[in-house]
């Protein structure tokens, strides 16, 4: 993975310490050309949410031409699992589950537990696809997904395969 040394590269990463040096080496990006947005799970939940807004600003204000959405291999948000198990949350979660399943487009479908504990590979693939097909992201911007795997003591990087959905917005928004 060779990145043009003079171009800014945006990394949307999980909240994990120590990823930047690994990513600099893997992508051949210098520290001064590296921009980072961190969120739990490196997830973009909505095509017009705050994280996507930050990505778009970075593209236009910092001349970003390449974006990497980076997750930790097969990591699940354990905090989310703890939230759904709290007794004080059960009624709220039941109400939210109803909304998730019956009040689209405001909610994503599924359950609160699925939303909080989504698999990292699915999250990365969806986020890459959402950025790639967003109407405000120029077609020249390359968007790739990466996983950092810490097994065996030495981190390794794997590229996420392309997902070909072709749309960043739900079907009901396109009609």
From Swiss-Prot:
<dbReference type="InterPro" id="IPR001765">
    <property type="entry name" value="Carbonic_anhydrase"/>
</dbReference>
<dbReference type="GO" id="GO:0008270">
    <property type="term" value="F:zinc ion binding"/>
</dbReference>
<dbReference type="InterPro" id="IPR036874">
    <property type="entry name" value="Carbonic_anhydrase_sf"/>
</dbReference>
<comment type="similarity">
    <text>Belongs to the beta-class carbonic anhydrase family.</text>
</comment>
<dbReference type="GO" id="GO:0004089">
    <property type="term" value="F:carbonate dehydratase activity"/>
</dbReference>
<protein>
    <recommendedName>
        <fullName>Putative carbonic anhydrase-like protein YbcF</fullName>
    </recommendedName>
</protein>
């Amino acid at each position: 993975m060779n990145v043009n040394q003079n171009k800014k590269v945006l990394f949307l990463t999980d909240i994990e310490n120590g990823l930047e040096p690994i990513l600099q080496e893997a992508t051949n990006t210098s520290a001064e050309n590296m921009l980072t947005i961190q969120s739990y799970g490196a997830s973009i939940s909505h095509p017009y949410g705050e994280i996507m807004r930050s990505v778009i600003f970075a593209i236009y204000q910092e001349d970003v031409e390449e974006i990497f959405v980076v997750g930790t291999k097969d990591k699940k948000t354990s905090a989310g699992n703890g939230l759904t198990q709290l007794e004080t949350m059960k009624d709220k979660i039941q109400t939210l589950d109803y909304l998730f399943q019956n009040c689209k487009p405001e909610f994503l479908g599924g359950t609160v537990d699925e939303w909080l504990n989504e698999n990292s590979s699915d999250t990365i693939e969806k986020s890459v696809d959402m950025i790639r097909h967003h109407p405000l992201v120029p077609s020249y911007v390359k968007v790739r997904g990466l996983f950092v795997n810490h097994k065996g003591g030495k981190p390794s990087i794997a590229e996420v395969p392309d997902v070909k959905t072709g749309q960043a917005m739900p079907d009901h928004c396109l009609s």
